Amino acid sequence: MRSTLNFNSHWQFTKPGAAPVAVTLPHTWNAADGTDGGNDYFRGTCTYTKEFAAPAHADDEEVWLEFEGAAMTAVVTLNDQELTRHAGGYSTFRVNLTPALAAQNTLTVTVDNSANRTVYPQKADFTFYGGLYRDVHILIVPHSHFALDNHGAPALRVTPEVSDDLHSAAVTVKAACENTPDGTEVLFAIESVGEQTAAMHGG
């Protein structure tokens, strides 16, 4: 069973040339200079740091971190070990903390909203706000789980097909799974008003 924990509080934010300040996510460093109508707001690299104890989890569980948005590029480091890099300020991404997780941890997220020719959009009529401007969550999952690293997308793809007379429907479900032993079967059930109306399973 997956557990989701809010991870928005108790961050330290550092802007170049300034002392760290305590912030709660969501946060952007352009809250003031990005809303005055000019095009002179700060675009550069800033750092978010958080000290935290490892969340309670079983030996056969994994601990992941989910970012709903980091504008525009991000580097995630845990206990001085770089875990991932992400480009794209408007997409969710997740990272497995388990290999570097200790009892007490230092998490550093370096975020950069500088102009970048490899990250879109390139131009817009809005501010390219920098920061961790959406929620961050801890995810605790079994070792065998629906995939979390598919570019932030859900691991389930559901495609309905309704008959022309609207009397019947077929549903195709595809699941991306991680660390599943050979022969593993996934059971899907369709429920309506608390009652199961259909079920199927596949490898």
Question: Which residue stretches match the model-derived regions?
Answer:
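Generic structural motif
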Residues: S9-W11, L156-P160, E191
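Short, well-ordered turn and helix-capping elements at secondary-structure junctions
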Residues: D33, E82, Y90, P160-V162
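A short, sequence-level motif marking secondary-structure junctions
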Residues: H27-W29, G89-S91, H201-G203
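Surface beta-strand/loop "capping" patches
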Residues: H143-N179
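Beta-strand-rich binding/interaction modules
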Residues: V76-L78, L166-G202
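Extracellular glycan-recognition surfaces and repeat-rich motifs
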Residues: W11, A18-G34
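Accessory beta-strand-rich segments of carbohydrate-active enzymes
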Residues: S3-L5, S9-P16, N39, R43-D149, ...
